[in-house]
Structures are given as C-alpha cells and as structure tokens.
C-alpha cells in the first residue's frame, strides 16, 4: 500500500522522462498545493475549478515542452456564463490562474455550455525574441482534446495529452501526462501507439496518489525509462502594491477623488488572481504621482 509519505514526495512536481528504445519523450506533473492556493480565494463552481485545473496542467506541460525562457498564457474567452478562464505560467514553473463567471454554472455543465461562443488563445512570450499567439477553435468536447490538437498542429509531432482533475484524500488535485514522438524523426508511429495505449490505462488514483517513478513503472515496466530530475511547481501571482498603484493612476484625478470621497478616504485595490488587498489613501496616491514624474 502506498503511504502518505510515499506519494506526497512528488506533490507539486514536474518530471521529464525519455523512453530509451522508443524515441518518445514524456512529461508528468501533479498540482496539489499549487491548485489549492489557486482556488482558496475564490468560490468558483466545480466545473470551473476542473477547467482551471486542466488548463494549469496543460500550461505546465507546454512550458516544459517548449524549453524556453519566458511565459505562456492560455486563455479562454466566450459569451456564455464563463466569460474568461486564464492561466499564466513561466519557465520556472510558477503559475497563476483566474476565471470570471457571469451566470449559473452547474456541476456537470459541458465546456461548450459554459463558454458559449468562444475561442482558446495561447500566447507565448519569450524573454528574447518575438511573441507568438495562436487562436484555437473550441471544436472538441473537452479543453484537453482542444489542447492536444494544438500540440499536434503547432509542433507537427504526434502528441498524447492526459489530464485529470478531482480530489485525493479530500483535497483538490490536478495531474497530467504528455507523450510526444521525438522531433529528430527517429521515432515510429508504432512505438508511439504502443506507449500511448499503455498511458491511456492510467487510473485517477494512480495519477493523484503515486510518486512519478512508481507510476511510470506500473505503466511501462517492460520499457527502459530515463527519469530526469524534478522541477518544483508553485502558485505565484506576482502582484504588488506598485503594480496596483500604477493601475490606479490610469484613471483621472477627478475619478480618484470621487472614489476616495465615496469610500471614506481609502481605495481598496484587490488582486483578481490571489485576492490580496492594497489600500491607497490620498497621501499614498500623491506619493505615487510624484514617483511617476
């Protein structure tokens, strides 16, 4: 039986691995505290929580696959009750997510009913070089299938994406695996099909409750799998009083004075992502203005 100590060693970790004789590479990630921290300050409907979990896992896997310095934003916009779902992650596996809901969303509501008429936008912003943006139609039943199609079309490589969200020992968890044929052309469709068939047998409790090494052994015990050192994953918002103050100064002095008068001399700027409050009185705002000049 797997003990708590066994499985928690790989909570909030991302691993890369390579099949030595198959020319196929893989990634595995599990979000525990990272996912909980994302949800803690919001009362999202269950269907929205699950969608954000899928998008977060996919973003982690995408940043690891592309191997670049910078950040990636995965964003859904629509005209349904879910107006926006957004995830941003970087090459350090720091990730944040938020959603905007305007309407009733039931627990088992489908992706298309939540979003209505919408699109999936992936923005890749390297620290150096040109920014890239891809717009993907939401023509598949799940976001995982839409993203898998994106991987295949954008990189022209056979790719399998498995993402699950749920609970393990009473706590939210999101986890996933990516398999991709090597870009050097040495992999065969037969090798890829063999490995993806095995991966498709993975159970939720295995993804959520096993260390990476044990999970890979269960799935691929007849294969030689090289497992590389893990990378930590964490929730990181990046908000600050300075950024909130800069946003506040985008509105006119007249509007600022009206808000100050309405709210007893203090403006509360709350971060939409992590829920942190930043308070600005007249003196603080004048100081911001002086430093901006």
Swiss-Prot record:
A family per Pfam: HSP33
Keyword presence, Protein transport: no
Protein name, UniProt field: 33 kDa chaperonin
CDD domains: Hsp33
Species, as recorded: Haemophilus influenzae (strain PittEE)
Chain's role: Redox regulated molecular chaperone. Protects both thermally unfolding and oxidatively damaged proteins from irreversible aggregation. Plays an important role in the bacterial defense system toward oxidative stress.
Family: Belongs to the HSP33 family.
Gene Ontology process terms (BP): protein refolding
């Amino acid at each position: 039986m797997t003990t708590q100590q066994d499985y928690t060693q790989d909570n909030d970790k991302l691993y890369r691995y390579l099949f030595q004789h198959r020319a196929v590479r893989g990634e595995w990630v599990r979000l525990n505290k990272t996912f909980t921290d994302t949800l803690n300050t919001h009362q999202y409907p269950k269907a929205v929580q699950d969608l954000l979990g899928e998008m977060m896992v996919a973003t982690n896997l995408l940043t690891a696959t592309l191997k670049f310095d910078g950040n990636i934003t995965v964003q859904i916009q629509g005209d349904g009750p879910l107006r926006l779902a957004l995830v941003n992650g970087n090459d350090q596996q720091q990730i944040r997510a938020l959603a905007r809901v305007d309407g009733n969303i039931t627990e088992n509501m489908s992706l298309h009913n939540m979003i209505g008429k919408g699109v999936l936008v992936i923005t890749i912003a390297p620290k150096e070089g040109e920014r890239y943006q891809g717009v993907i139609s939401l023509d598949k039943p799940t976001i995982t299938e839409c993203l898998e199609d994106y991987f295949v079309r954008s990189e022209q490589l056979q790719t399998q994406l498995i993402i699950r969200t749920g609970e393990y020992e009473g706590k939210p968890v999101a986890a996933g695996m990516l398999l991709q044929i090597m870009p050097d052309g040495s992999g065969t469709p037969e090798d890829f099909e063999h490995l993806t068939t095995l991966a498709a047998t993975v159970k939720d409790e295995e993804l959520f409750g096993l260390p990476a090494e044990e999970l890979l052994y269960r799935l691929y015990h007849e294969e030689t799998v090289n497992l590389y050192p893990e990378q930590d994953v964490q929730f990181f918002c990046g908000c600050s009083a300075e950024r909130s103050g800069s946003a506040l100064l985008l509105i006119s002095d007249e509007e600022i004075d009206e808000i100050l008068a309405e709210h007893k001399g203090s403006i509360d700027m709350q971060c939409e992502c992590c829920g942190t409050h930043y308070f600005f009185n007249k003196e603080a705002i004048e100081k911001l203005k002086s430093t901006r000049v």
